[in-house]
Amino acid sequence: MFPMVTEFMNYGQQTVRAARYIGQGFIITLSHANRLPVTIQYPYEKLITSERFRGRIHFEFDKCIACEVCVRVCPIDLPVVDWKLETDIRKKRLLNYSIDFGICIFCGNCVEYCPTNCLSMTEEYELSTYDRHELNYNQIALGRLPMSIIDDYTIRTILNLPEIKT
């Protein structure tokens, strides 16, 4: 056969194959069009966090015995515990406790191993600031309880995500 005719036949086959691939992609796109959206409108809708969510650490100053277990179990030696030994009663007195959440990896080891349960994980995960030095929380900032998402009337909470079918 003539080379021009065979090239034209190959061109036709390639065109049909390309149209088939485009059609298959279009069918997949149309099958996803009737599904519910997966995203939520973040500032106005928030998911309720799970029971064991590891958010910001809450600290209770009165319960702390300055044993420094939290510092020893932390993989990055993050909590700063300042204490003074009271010689008359032979006990440590806690002076200062701080955690830098810019460095914290939220592993929860400090909460898990604390013998007096003065540390706990909260639901708070919005810790963004414009200055990284504001992420260094002292015992006063760590002692504040976060506002619960459930109690905030300006935010619509979503109890659970719709199941995603694959």
UniProtKB/Swiss-Prot annotation:
Q: Name one Pfam family in it.
A: Fer4
Residues binding [4Fe-4S] cluster 2 = 74, 104, 107, 110
Query: What GO molecular-function term can you cite, just one?
Result: quinone binding
Its cellular-component GO annotations read:
chloroplast thylakoid membrane
Q: Report the principal subcellular site.
A: plastid
Assigned keywords, A-Z: 4Fe-4S, Chloroplast, Iron, Iron-sulfur, Membrane, Metal-binding, NAD, NADP, Plastid, Plastoquinone, Quinone, Repeat, Thylakoid, Translocase
Q: Which residues bind [4Fe-4S] cluster 1?
A: 64, 67, 70, 114
In what way does this protein cross or attach to the membrane? Peripheral membrane protein
* UniProt keyword 4Fe-4S, yes or no: yes
Q: What class of enzyme is it?
A: translocase
Q: How is the cofactor bound?
A: Binds 2 [4Fe-4S] clusters per subunit.
Q: Which PANTHER family match?
A: NAD(P)H-QUINONE OXIDOREDUCTASE SUBUNIT I, CHLOROPLASTIC
**Subunit comment for this entry?**
NDH is composed of at least 16 different subunits, 5 of which are encoded in the nucleus.
What is the stated purpose of this protein?
NDH shuttles electrons from NAD(P)H:plastoquinone, via FMN and iron-sulfur (Fe-S) centers, to quinones in the photosynthetic chain and possibly in a chloroplast respiratory chain. The immediate electron acceptor for the enzyme in this species is believed to be plastoquinone. Couples the redox reaction to proton translocation, and thus conserves the redox energy in a proton gradient.
Against NCBIfam families, the record matches this protein to:
ndhI (TIGR00403), NuoI (TIGR01971), PRK05888.1-3 (NF004537)
Sequence similarity: Belongs to the complex I 23 kDa subunit family.
Q: What is this protein called?
A: NAD(P)H-quinone oxidoreductase subunit I, chloroplastic
Organism of derivation: Stevia rebaudiana
